[in-house]
Amino acid sequence: MRHSRKRGHSGVSRPAVNMVVSGGFMKICEQLHMIKGVTAVIGSGGKTTLLRILAEELSGTVILTTSTHILPFAGIPLLVTDDIEQVRRALALHRVICMGTPAAEGKLTAPALPFSVLANAADYVIVEADGSKRLPLKAHASHEPVIPENTRKTVCVVCASGFGKPVKQAVHRPELFCARTGAHMSGIVTPKLAAQGIIAENLADIVVLNQAETVSPEIAKRFTETLKSSGFTVVCTTLNHTLE
């Protein structure tokens, strides 16, 4: 397992499209150009919801798990094991399972089996590889995110609700955000500053702007165009899962 993997080293070609705006019947998994193997989801508000949406949409077998901490998913079987044959049997029965190691406060930590082993059992292993203290935006410390070695795609989630708010209220690790973007702790998070933070860290292959419908098209455009100019693919959407 490794920390802070810079993008561009996955061995997978980046999609040619630079910006996708959610609409019609295009699934999130299609917009993200999901590929089989390990996908790491990092960033802020909406990571766990994105994991669930992808599990619902993808047609193959799926393991939802974490390299940090995550709560179990309601309605999705939880498997705690170091036996890969149990994993295969569970996937054959349920198609989608959650895996991890029980920890404090009902949370799960990383599973007992290596992610590379899980990837040999399931079509997709989707790993929540970050935490954000439930804030809409985040800057990463040197030990973050915790991206598995064999990750083929890294998706960064950003919540549009953080735009227009003071840095110290909207950003997890605001001091790092300020250092990388030139923002001030009492200053306002603009779409351009949020994008500049992502560019400076250079951790993701693709960026998801969650709750895009809560901001004006012009604000969303400023965010996406700044990222587009640096070669990032951006999906603008509002993440909602269909299962209760």
PLM features per residue range, with description:
Residues 8-11, 20-24:
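Residue-identity detector for glycine
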Residues 13-15:
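Short, low-complexity intrinsically disordered segments enriched in A/P/G/S/L with frequent Arg
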Residues 27-58:
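Walker A (P-loop) phosphate-binding motif
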Residues 36-41, 94-105, 129, 180-182:
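Short, basic, glycine/proline-bearing loop/turn elements
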Residues 41-42, 62-67, 98-101, 125-129, ...:
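General beta-strand structural signal in soluble alpha/beta enzymes
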Residues 55-102:
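N-terminal phosphate/diphosphate-binding loop that engages ATP/GTP or pyrophosphate donors
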Residues 106-121, 130-230, 242-244:
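Conserved catalytic-core segment of NTP-binding enzymes
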